[in-house]
């Protein structure tokens, strides 16, 4: 009775009804295969042998090519005996990034396509910095490596108010991994506890250097980026707010637009602020001025940060990486 009462207190009526539908679902698998090509690809792939020379890299559900996995892909580009695929939602944008950085040996596969499902089922090596969606299940003979993308300064998993039991897919992904990589002990402890995996996870957990941080110290790239964008005589800042953990909050875009509009009006002429919003809120968001501009799609964010003079953020763990450069950090915590 206590468990039932706790469940009703923590889980809204709407979510309980949704859970009932899922538990009693008797859908036609043929329908699923026809409507969702990635499901068909994944199921077809179960009948095929695992390809030992194939590597799949997915960052933030295909929304970006950046950070740890961009740095890793740059190194894997030199391995001619592997077929390396990066998952991308926007193939044209992703191809532009590969072209800029001359990553000729890296191929692309469109997120949620038939080929995507097929490759997830047949690639021997799977690398992610977030999670694969719930339809994915690792086969025997596959190796799954997760390089978690951030340091959890805020709450995650069961610690997020109103998100009871919604961390299940993340926990499930972690349980399937062969190895988990974190840049510090704090991240490892915080994540595993918030996902209820502390003491039960069988994966190898490593505390290791951040591959993406090496990009911050490339002084040649710093000069080249400033020259390419004609900003050599400007003070450059990058604004990167974090995700606030609520997909239903429709005011987020409005808030960010107000912030950027205010900056555009008040910044002096010798200062430019480039912004990169969290991948969870960038859909349909557009703002561009003279002094406030979106981060160009053709640059990896860590590569670009080698050329900036300071970072503006709120709770984003990117501040920890940026601090290694000994540059200015402005914490703009307007909702603290």
Q: What does each model-identified segment do?
A:
Residues 53-217:
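Active-site and donor-binding regions of nucleotide-sugar-utilizing enzymes
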Residues 118-119, 137, 173, 230, ...:
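Structural alpha-helical scaffold elements that stabilize or flank donor/cofactor-binding regions
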Residues 1-53:
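Membrane-proximal basic amphipathic "stem/tether" segments
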Residues 41-51, 136, 171, 226-230, ...:
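Short boundary motifs at domain starts and secondary-structure transition points
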Residues 88-92, 279, 335:
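Residues in the short beta-alpha loop(s) of Rossmann-like NAD(P)-binding domains
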Residues 125-155, 299-336:
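A donor-sugar binding/catalytic signature common to diverse glycosyltransferases
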């Amino acid at each position: 009775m206590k468990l039932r009462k706790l469940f009703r207190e923590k889980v809204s009526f709407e979510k309980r009804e949704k859970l009932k539908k899922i538990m009693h679902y008797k859908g036609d698998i043929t329908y699923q295969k026809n409507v969702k090509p990635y499901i068909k690809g994944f199921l077809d792939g179960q009948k095929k042998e695992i390809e030992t020379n194939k590597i799949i890299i997915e960052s933030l559900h295909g929304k970006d090519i950046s950070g740890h996995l961009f740095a890793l892909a740059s190194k894997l580009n030199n391995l001619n005996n592997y077929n390396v695929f990066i998952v991308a939602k926007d193939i044209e944008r992703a191809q532009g990034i590969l072209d800029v950085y001359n990553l000729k040996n890296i191929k692309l596969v469109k997120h949620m396509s038939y080929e995507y499902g097929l490759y997830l089922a047949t690639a021997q090596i799977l690398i992610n910095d977030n999670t694969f969606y719930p339809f994915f299940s690792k086969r025997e003979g596959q190796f799954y490596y997760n390089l978690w993308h951030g340091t959890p300064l805020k709450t995650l998993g069961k610690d997020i108010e109103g998100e009871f039991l919604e961390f299940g897919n993340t926990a499930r992904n972690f349980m399937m991994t062969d190895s988990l990589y974190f840049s510090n002990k704090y991240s490892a402890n915080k994540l595993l506890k918030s996902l209820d995996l502390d003491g039960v996870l069988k994966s190898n957990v490593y505390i290791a250097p951040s591959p993406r941080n090496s990009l911050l110290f490339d002084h040649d790239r710093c000069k080249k980026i400033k020259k390419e964008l004609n900003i050599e005589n400007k003070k450059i800042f990058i604004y990167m707010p974090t995700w606030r953990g609520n997909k239903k909050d429709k005011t987020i875009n409005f808030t960010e637009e107000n912030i950027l509009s205010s900056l555009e009006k008040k910044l002096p002429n010798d200062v430019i602020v480039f912004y990169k919003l969290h991948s969870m809120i960038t859909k349909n968001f557009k703002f561009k001025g003279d002094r406030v501009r979106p981060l160009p799609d053709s640059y990896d964010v860590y590569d670009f940060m080698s050329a900036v003079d300071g970072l503006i953020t709120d709770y984003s763990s990117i501040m920890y990486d940026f601090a290694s450069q000994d540059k200015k950090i402005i914490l703009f915590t307007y909702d603290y």
